[in-house]
């Protein structure tokens, strides 16, 4: 089954958030009828959704970017384009740019890329000329062309041929444009799957005495991590008045911050495994990891397994700008320690620890212990059933092959497919 609907109608649906409203109405009707008796325990998992675009290489992206911009100008500013277009552009961009029509030799492909780059710069120079109408710059196809050229080429220099960026100077996947036909469809990789498109998180009830009703569909860019989706999902469930007591999630979702915030803000217990301590001691299963140190939070002191106290307690931020505490021990004491090799691999520096804020640290350490118990594992095993819902969406409704052209339309289509499920 594939959902099709006319463009203007689709626009009205998007503006009104119709897919969420319909799902909310359905859930409350099910509740009123007695079919939905409880939503105490729910589970969520994400899957990839392909964008409705061809996979383009760099040369195709450049050519298509130029073609889209020219096609847009031909519709909204035909007179202006007629006076600024170059004769060669009709041959180069008159039809879809496809790899089988492009040169095969690397030298010829590089030369064509430079030619397309020069064409794009000439068009942008004309559009940004003071005498050109300023509204031309707001045309989506033109802005997409500008962004692609910034990402693919170095800044132009006078009397120097336009130069492609090297791979190391290319933008990260979070902003890289892979097709001018959908600038929000980004490349992402998860486990063994690589795709260009989006991500959808489906939440369903998994209480033993309740049917498996889907309660929420949350669509994100493909580059948004699962852990970043936890708070928006809980916020949406709160708006629906469908918050669970327990939320079963796989290892991609739980973090110390999510464990704490979910409990304090929504009174939800996340049932999901947290990542193990990344230290070499934990990986080698020998030596002293952070769990072997005693922390005195009130006095801001840490005691090592040998009974020595830390000398520095510094507040800071990690690479994600999240608050952490950096603890350091005395250099002389550490260098003379008889079990130094079990504590640090540094030949001269003392042992250092990076701790999370107290509440998060305790929540993380507690979960690492409880997730080893048979009782916890038995509860968590119920999370696996969400994959059958994904299978239904894939095989029966074709979620991964919906015609998705923009992020909001992705959300709309995924929401309606959820209702059909």
Predicted regions and their residues:
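Anion-binding and metal-coordination hotspots
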Residues: 3-421
